[in-house]
Amino acid sequence: MMAEEGITWDSPHAVEARQKKEGTFLIDGNEAAALGSIYGGVNMLSWYPITPSSSLAEGIIHWLPQLRETEDGMSTCAVVQAEDELAAAGMVLGAGWAGGRGMT
């Protein structure tokens, strides 16, 4: 049985499927923030895995190989998983004091 079979209720909040547009894609807010951070020049990410910020760090980790690697395969952004939020904040402060553009 298909999911649509037997359903008669018309939702006023239904979303119609759109045709796929060439050159566009749909992302969530954390993925957009990840891409914005990469294009904004972040070169140090320290993070502690906790909802809702984990997907932001995972987005950066996903996009770095495609967008921020040198010709010899070296990344231009360090990603460090900290043991807690305080350690992550300390790493970002250290990156800033050293002239880097860090985020947590």
Question: What annotation goes with each model-predicted range?
Answer:
Residues 1-104:
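Thiamine diphosphate
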